[in-house]
């Protein structure tokens, strides 16, 4: 089971039947800083008081309620040598697509944010492939996320074809792969179940 970089609650660990947590760092789910409560999962500073005196975070409650009596279990990021990052996509980028792809690689290498803005069908997904392949070959982890479940469900088979020798985890509401992987496809809110786990995060349909 892939726990590298995971940030989970005790309830989630029980549901996943994780018994060995000796290598996890345990932190309070909510902390009080300068007289203000902050959620350690989503970083929200909008606490709500419960009748029994506990404080809970209302911002990420959809992932399960966290209170001031709860803890988060953070597992150290570790390289998972499970895929070779070989690109098994046999298409060819157009000159304009190649220019955009090269610019993305340069930005990632320099640690800069990068925006690819193009119409539907312009090949934005394919432009990502060389950068992702390079990072996985460098033993780094990549997350492809979107606010929309349908986007992740549509992307999953395309990435599994393009990276046939690299195990891929897919996670969204109602679907939770437990595969060890260097490449994650997930809805955006699933990232709250990770802590400093990825070397590159790509947000698709960022305006959705």
List each language-model region with its residue ranges.
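Conserved RecA-like ASCE P-loop NTPase motor core of nucleic-acid helicases/translocases
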Residues: 140-148
